[in-house]
Amino acid sequence: MQRLDPWHGRCDLQFHATNGSTKHQGGCTAPFKLLRSERGEDGRCELPVLHTAGGLVGGDQLSLDFKLEANSRGLITSVAAQKVYGSIGRSRLQPEGCFAHQQVRCSLASGSDLEWLPQELVLYADALFEQQLTVTLPQDASFLSAEIVRLGRTAAGETLQQGRWRSSLTIQRLAGESSTWELADRVELGGASLESPHGLGGAPVFGTLVWAAPMAMGAETTASVLEGARADREGLTGTMRCGALNQGLIARYSGESSRDARFWFSRIWERTRTIRGLTRPRIPRVWPLQEQPLRRQTSTVNAFEAAAETH
């Protein structure tokens, strides 16, 4: 039986600021494809990335490398949910299965601002997936990411079964020749941890938002941001917790609804813009049109309405 080589897709992008707006250059290889970028109200380059293969199988690799020059601003998202198909027991050559891998590297220069907001990751039964997100940035740069994973196709009555999901997230602050860790986070979900009360407790959805702020916020500002993020949980289901980093915050979601995770993270995303005096975020055009996570209930700042009823 002939063994096919795994697919390795690459996406290398550079962002540079000019005349108050940010432009990108670079390119990608199959299965990646770049769609038309848009200019945000703050001059930010908003760029959707399409994965044309329709999903990942064991052995596939994705490598994304983003470099932001001084004072540039970017928002990168995916066009659709990423699917990872089952691997265990699918091959006579490797009945134990093989991990698919994704590695994202982000390098930010002084005064730059990157928002990495991919759509949901869906692991099918017996899927094996490992992801790495590595960020380096100076003290005055901003990085925000929000990633959500669904472990099993819940609507079809499916669980992850023997599958596993691994995640490594590291954020390193650079100051001349020295550096400090803003965050070093490693998570592995599979087996007993899916049902354990010390793991997901049977919840199929897990998400993490992290923001490395471009300024020292101080105790009072940090407490205010966290209080607001906790208030943003109103009307949403699931377990939602948040806490402070040295210079930023981290938020976790676990529950039944990827929509509620997305709504909560979107509201925190808006807060990270507001605290810096930036324009309200604009929901990317490739996100589900029926959802309006930032719609306000009243004119009161940071009061929101979850418009969609489906999960």
Swiss-Prot record:
Its main location: cytoplasm. It is found in: Cytoplasm. Keywords: Chaperone, Cytoplasm, Nickel insertion. The keyword Hydrolase does not apply. The keyword Cytoplasm applies. UreD, UreF and UreG form a complex that acts as a GTP-hydrolysis-dependent molecular chaperone, activating the urease apoprotein by helping to assemble the nickel containing metallocenter of UreC. The UreE protein probably delivers the nickel. HAMAP family: UreD. This is Urease accessory protein UreD. It comes from Synechococcus sp. (strain CC9605). The lineage of its organism: Bacteria, Bacillati, Cyanobacteriota, Cyanophyceae, Synechococcales.
